[in-house]
Amino acid sequence: MSGYYRYPTINNSKIVFVADDDLWLVELDNPNAIRLTTNLSEVSTPLLSPNGKWIAYVGSEDGNNEVYIMSSEGGPSTRLTYDGSFVSKIAAWNGEDIIFATDLSQPFGRVSNLAKINRKGGPTTLLKYGIS
């Protein structure tokens, strides 16, 4: 597969990346890439969970950039955030929580703070680290 690959994330034998505005998976023992999403909108900054079972990513399927999660085996994505704010990047996993950069509660757009949300859903919690 030739193309322009962006935002690679690696966990053990799995590599997930963005190409053609979708998520793709390659396992080290199988060089064939598998398309995980077929969205009409753009996806970015995927991040595999520490156990390799989940992929958190930024998507704009419903308009705003929001946090989504899906199984690394494929299947449907679940939208986790409904904040209506700009999410720019999935930064890290912390146990069951996904840490991400957002302009939620900022008076000016594109000024980001770190926030977290549980992979099972729930409210977004702003982290008190200042501007990210």
Question: What spans do the regions from the language model cover?
Answer:
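A flexible loop/linker signature enriched in serine peptidases of the S9 family
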Residues: 18-24, 38-43, 56-68, 76, ...
